[in-house]
Every structure is written in structure tokens, then in C-alpha cells.
Amino acid sequence: MKLKPIEVAEILQKEIANINCLSELEEVGQVISVGDGIAKIYGLANVKSGEVVEFKSGVKGLVLNLENDSVGAVIMGDDNQVQQGDNVKRTKEVLEVPIGKALLGRVVDALGNPIDGKGDIASKEYRHIEMKAPGIIERTSVSEPVQTGIKAIDSLIPIGRGQRELIIGDRQTGKTAIAVDTIINQKQAHSLTNESDKIYCIYVAIGQKRSSVAQIVKKLEDAGAMDYTIVVSATASEAAALQFIAPYSACSMGEYFRDNGMHALIIYDDLSKHAVAYRQISLLLRRPPGREAYPGDVFYLHSRLLERAAKMSEEKGSGSLTALPIIETQAGDVSAYIPTNVISITDGQIFLESELFYKGVRPAVNVGISVSRVGSAAQIKAMKQVAGSVKLELAQFRELESFSQFGSDLDPATKAQIDHGKRLVEILKQAQYHPFPVEEQIVSIYVGTKKYLNDVPLQKVKEFEDKMLTEIRLNKKDILESIKNEQRITEETEQKLKAFLENFVKEFVK
């Protein structure tokens, strides 16, 4: 059988069309120099800022500097695996992390890879780590509370869903303890079936010791709080690039809950080390330094991160993302560059003082200079009823206390006010990892403000509170239930509470 030339050509064309090895064009560059986690690359003319590039060894890099004849990229991993002369190819992608409920209960690195030895994460959804913050129209004002379980905070510096409240203080003053207590306190809401009460938590460890992160994870597991928590870890031993991107990755994980009508709480521990990591990257990329050697855009570094926390409008599903950034100060200096930046970005701050901490006032919250600019709108009515006067009374007490150091003879009214102030300070003290339900906090603060503690010796206030709460849980549960359900203290409940407390104080003082 003879084939005509035209038929042969047709057969060849069909066969060629069926071959599955179409060539792909890849844009490739070369590493000119590498060191300190930074690679300088020549030849990637069309690469974009923020794009991911892949080195010969499989390690990924993030392009941050675009220069005339080269590109500066930070290496997200071990820079020993990158050699001078290695080929680098464009991926034409920006950084993405896995998101969704599959991450709950897991410990992941800054890129969303599991590091807890519990296998792969079955997440099908991915999200860019840098997302635009919601606009003004998409938001609504803060109106629902985030209960931290800490009396001093829930009564005096309340936090609302969608708020950004800074926790600031020197090292070893209990900043992380407040954050961990807040996570543990959400367990009660997660035991209920109502989805709108639940707050999912994300804890981001930036530049911390591995032992500290392991300790926190262990504490959360023991408290049964890991079921609704994601831990993102970029420890001190990891590349500065990973410490720099960790908060953005975690924020994207939190935005999944916010944008799907759920509620999330994210803790950045801490943004001082985040700024230091970014300063290191910027200086190595030879960007011009500014104040304290930080680059000029260090304000934008944190503002674009914290602006992503929001309470969404009804049209957008009414979800929320609440942020608790932590800043470590040096010798109580809140006027340094990074602390002032973050104070101006956030909606209030909880200031912890080492002096109070060493005096035994724990949590060591300085009530005088701590504020919550939007949280009071979210505070429940019952708490407003009992805690309205506490801040003023404590301020007056601090003033009188410092004044009384100079004079020994005080008139009875001043002495009574100082004694009352001391008991208020005592009732606001709280053990670590023991958050209180809000209805029990209300009863405790009611006892303090209504002067039921005046006859109780100062050193026995803690014992009084413990016994009183145990008694009320066992025999007067209806009082707690009423406060919890009504969210205010009704006249009937107040009468019951007064009668109970009068009897209890008599019995206790005997």
C-alpha cells in the first residue's frame, strides 16, 4: 500500500500532536553572592517584588529588593544549601499558606508546614500571606466582648471582638501569661454548641526560645485548649525571613474564620522581635537605616498587619478577628520607637509593670496608664454596673498611698479609703492559668466595691474570695445563672446576693 506524500505528512502531524512533552519556558537566574540569609541574584529581569523564587536545592526565597542589575531575596530556610553560581528559577507565585479548621490543634512553621510530628495537614484551601485590610464600609463598630477571664482586664480594660489591644511591659512581667489565660478562658464557650460564642485562637511565637514554645503548647494541651488553637512558631534559631513572615501567615489563617462569619483571636508574641528580624533583613539588603537603625517603613510593617483585625459588617457575615500584639520594653521605656509606633496603631494598651509584679500584684497591670479605647462598648451591662467606680477608686487610692508615706497621722476617712483601696487591689489579684467565668468575676468585684471586705483582714481576702465563690457555686447557683443569662444584675438578684454576702461575711469573720 503506497501512501501519498500528503497522507504521510498528515500522519506525522497527528503523531507529533499526541506527544505529551511540550517544552516549558522557565526564567532562570544565577546566585551572584549569598550570606546571612540573603541571596543576590542576576538574570531575573521580569521577577516581581514579593514573588517566591526556587533555588537549585529546592529551598525557597522571597524577593524583596529589585535593583538595576540584580535582585535581593531572603532565603526561607538554611542558607548553607544555597551556593554561589546556583541556578534560581521564578515560580510566578506569591507566598501562600494553608488555611481552615484542619489547622486547629496543630503546631506549624511560618509557611504552614506541620512541625508537631502529627502527620500532614489535610487543608485544601490556601491564602496569600499579604492581604488587603477590610475597608471602612466592610467594618462595623466593636460591640461584643472577648472575655479574658482576668478580673483586672475584663472589669477595667475590656476588650471587644475586632479590637487590637496591645500588651506591653518589660521582660518577665507576665505578658505571655495574660495571652495564654485568654486562650484557656475560651474553653467554656467551645463546650457550648452555639457557633457565635466560640472564639478560635492563633498563637504566633516570633523569635522565642524553642523550650518556651514547647512549654506553652504543653500548657494549652493540659488545659484542653489546643482543640481550638493554632500555634505558629518561628523561633530564634530560624531564619530572620521566617520570623518576618510568621505574623502575616498566622493572620491569613485567622482571616479564614473572620471572613466565614466566625470569630478568631490572634496573639503576636512578640512584635519587638518581629521588628528586629525585619531590621536585620533590611540592613543586609542595604536599605537606608533610620531611627534606632530601623528602616523607614517599620511603621507600615506593623500597621498593615494590625489593620487586618476587624469586626465585619452584617453583609460580610459579622465575623471578627481580634489582635493582641505583645511588645517588650527595655526598663519600662514606652517612649522608644517600636512601642510608640504600636501604641498609636492599636485601640488601647495593657501596661504591665515590673515594680507591681515584684510587689506581688499579679497580673501586674498598671490600671492608671492602661486604656481600652473601644472595648467599653463591648462590656456586658452587669460588669459596667459593678466596675464603673473601680478605676477612679484605685486612682484615688494610689494618690493617697503615695501621699501617706510622708505623714503618719491620717484622719479616719483617709485611712478608711486607703484600707478600701488595698482590699480592691487584693481582690483583683489572680493566679496564673486560673481564668474566672465573667459571672464569678462580677460577684468578686461586687464584694470589693460594696465594701463587704472592710471587716475581713487584708491577708485573708484571697481565702475569703475562694470560700465565697465555692459556696455560691454549690448553694446559690441561681445568682450566677441569673447574671450569666440576663447579662445584668436585676433587683431581685441583687437582693439575693446582698442577703447571701451579709450572712457569709458574719460567718467568715467569727
Curated annotation (Swiss-Prot):
Major site of localization recorded for this protein: membrane
EC number per UniProt: 7.1.2.2
Superkingdom field: Bacteria
tRNA processing listed as a keyword: no
Annotated positions binding ATP: G169, D170, R171, Q172, T173, G174, K175, T176
Enzyme class of the recorded protein, top EC level: translocase
Keywords: ATP synthesis, ATP-binding, Cell inner membrane, Cell membrane, CF(1), Hydrogen ion transport, Ion transport, Membrane, Nucleotide-binding, Translocase, Transport
Reaction catalyzed: ATP + H2O + 4 H(+)(in) = ADP + phosphate + 5 H(+)(out)
PROSITE patterns from the UniProt entry: ATPASE_ALPHA_BETA
Molecular function via GO: ADP binding; ATP binding; proton-transporting ATP synthase activity, rotational mechanism
Record membrane topology: Peripheral membrane protein
Chain positions of site Required for activity: S370
TM stretches of this protein: none
GO cellular component, one term: plasma membrane
CDD domains, per database record: ATP-synt_F1_alpha_C (cd18113), ATP-synt_F1_alpha_N (cd18116), F1-ATPase_alpha_CD (cd01132)
Subunit structure: F-type ATPases have 2 components, CF(1) - the catalytic core - and CF(0) - the membrane proton channel. CF(1) has five subunits: alpha(3), beta(3), gamma(1), delta(1), epsilon(1). CF(0) has three main subunits: a(1), b(2) and c(9-12). The alpha and beta chains form an alternating ring which encloses part of the gamma chain. CF(1) is attached to CF(0) by a central stalk formed by the gamma and epsilon chains, while a peripheral stalk is formed by the delta and b chains.
Protein role: Produces ATP from ADP in the presence of a proton gradient across the membrane. The alpha chain is a regulatory subunit.
Family: Belongs to the ATPase alpha/beta chains family.
Protein name (record): ATP synthase subunit alpha
Organism: Rickettsia felis (strain ATCC VR-1525 / URRWXCal2)
Gene: atpA
